[in-house]
A protein has these predicted regions:
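A charged N-terminal "starter" segment
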Residues: 1-160, 199, 204-208, 235, ...
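Short acidic, glycine/serine/threonine-rich loops at helix termini
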Residues: 82-83, 106, 126-131, 148-151, ...
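Short beta-strand segments
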Residues: 73, 160-166, 213-215, 251-253, ...
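Active-site loop/helix belt of alpha/beta enzymes
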Residues: 3-9, 14, 167-309, 370, ...
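General structural feature for long, well-ordered alpha-helical segments within catalytic domains
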Residues: 32, 36, 48-51, 55, ...
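Charged (often Lys/Glu-rich) extended helix/loop segments that serve as interaction or gating elements
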Residues: 275, 284-436
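Active-site-proximal loop/turn and secondary-structure-junction residues that shape catalytic pockets
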Residues: 74-78, 99-100, 120-121, 141-143, ...
């Protein structure tokens, strides 16, 4: 597990080495988070560039000795500055929409840096992917494979594809919604379906099968699921080669766990890598990785200010200016995020930490011992660099928060806070009516 420090109240809080206290104040690398909040307001997402670099290099080092490429799953954090940071480290990207393809290109990625995943790619998205000459399109159904062949034929092109295998392996994750490799899941192809598609490929001259991959889910804390699933993937690659397909890579997806609370284990990256490397070397294939959360989650905190304190029917409430529209993970997944006072507070209180949204499900913590902060004080919600801003919304007509990147003793705004005018910018008064 990563380093742990004691909060001002004496309870353990997960941290990357980028977030430490100096004279009682939480710093992001060399910058006071109080100074950041004073400069840009709250709510504010803050990311540590140093943490992203450290995580990427750890993963790359673990896979040293085998041909590999790390494709960042940009659904975790799609800010252009984060993408450019990772591109500079040598990463490619794993995308799941045409919008993400656009963002990847805006961040400077070439088509050859892009792997396109997802179960519901539209015809236009496939057209755009082929026009961009992406490295691979991960196929998840026969209908999709046939659509790719049609689009490629219309362009006189050969589309590079990979099959996404569903190994039908039960995975232990914190929430059912983040399991993707189990039987009956919408993702991927069963072994039987892959066998059938290997025969279908004979009649589809405009697709070229380059690899087979899988993605078991998210927040996988041990290697047992991978140990069970890898032989299924190896068998699928062996069968494809026997059918005459020149498979040159295997994709093991992402899903490496990060700790969200004290005592929660982090994935054993080195053990995970060793299992994959052994299989890859035996097959003579390149390894593709699609980490998202692992690279950016611990890099981020969400700064929020206490608007009011309240007590009702024996329950203490800490009401903040951030809500589920800014960070939906606790409401959607019942996810745990450590919450600490930005400036040292000795007192503790058992309270619900909630937002201003008009929903009972708008909370960050329930009946939890937290710092007994007063109105106007700052809180830091930890491990929010992944699936925070990318899942934010304008619910209750709330502008999305500002994003800030810290690097050493400097910080920069990398996404301006939305303004009220932005909420209606795309809307039009119904003056021109059309007949069906």
């Amino acid at each position: 597990m990563g380093p742990i420090i004691l909060s001002s109240g004496g309870y353990p809080v997960i941290t990357s080495t980028a977030y430490e206290r100096r004279e009682g104040t939480l710093f992001a690398e060399g910058v006071s988070t109080v100074a950041i909040a004073d400069a840009v307001g709250t709510p504010a997402y803050v990311y540590s560039a140093g943490t992203v670099r450290t995580r990427y290099r750890r993963l790359a080092k673990a896979f040293h000795g085998v041909p590999h490429r790390i494709h960042f799953a940009m659904k975790a954090n799609a800010n252009l500055s984060i993408l450019r940071l990772l591109r500079g480290l040598g990463a490619g990207v794993d995308i799941v929409s045409g919008g993400e393809l656009f963002r990847a290109r805006e961040a400077g990625f070439q088509g050859s840096d892009v792997v396109f995943s997802g179960v519901g790619k539209t015809r236009r998205e496939i057209e755009d992917a082929l026009d961009a000459e992406v490295a691979l399109i991960n196929v998840e159904s026969e209908a999709e494979l046939r659509c790719i062949d049609e689009v490629a034929a219309a362009r006189g092109a050969i589309a590079p594809v990979a099959f996404r295998l569903n190994p039908e392996v039960t995975v232990s994750t914190p929430h059912a919604y983040i399991r993707t490799g189990e039987k009956g899941n919408k993702f991927g192809l069963s072994r039987e379906e892959i066998g059938r598609l290997l025969r279908v490929l004979t009649y589809l001259p405009n697709v070229s099968l380059r690899g087979i991959g899988m993605h078991l889910g998210s927040q996988i804390q041990d290697a047992e699921a991978l140990r069970t699933a890898l032989p299924v993937l190896v068998d699928a690659i062996t069968a494809a080669r026997a059918a005459g397909q020149p498979i040159d890579h295997m994709d093991v997806g992402g899903g490496l766990a990060v700790p969200y609370e004290s005592g929660e284990p982090e994935a054993d990256v080195e053990d995970y890598a060793q299992l994959v490397k052994e299989a890859a070397l035996a097959l003579g294939v390149q390894v593709l990785l699609e980490p998202g959360r692992f690279l950016v989650a611990e890099a981020g905190v969400l700064l929020t200010r206490v608007v009011y304190r309240k007590e009702s029917a024996g329950t203490a409430f800490v009401i903040t200016d951030a809500g589920m529209s800014d960070l939906i993970r606790p409401s959607l997944y019942d996810a745990h995020h450590e919450i600490e006072a930005v400036q040292a507070v000795e007192r503790q209180v058992v309270a619900d930490v909630v937002g201003p949204i008009c929903e009972s499900g708008d909370f960050f913590a329930k009946r939890r011992e937290v710092a007994d902060v007063a109105q106007g004080e700052l809180l830091a919600i930890r491990t929010t660099g992944a699936y925070g801003y990318t899942m934010a919304s304008n619910y209750n007509a709330r502008p999305r928060p500002v994003e800030v990147l810290v690097d050493g003793d400097q910080f920069a705004v990398i996404a301006e806070r939305e303004q009220y005018e932005d909420l209606v910018r795309l809307e039009r008064t119904a003056l021109t009516w059309r007949s069906a």
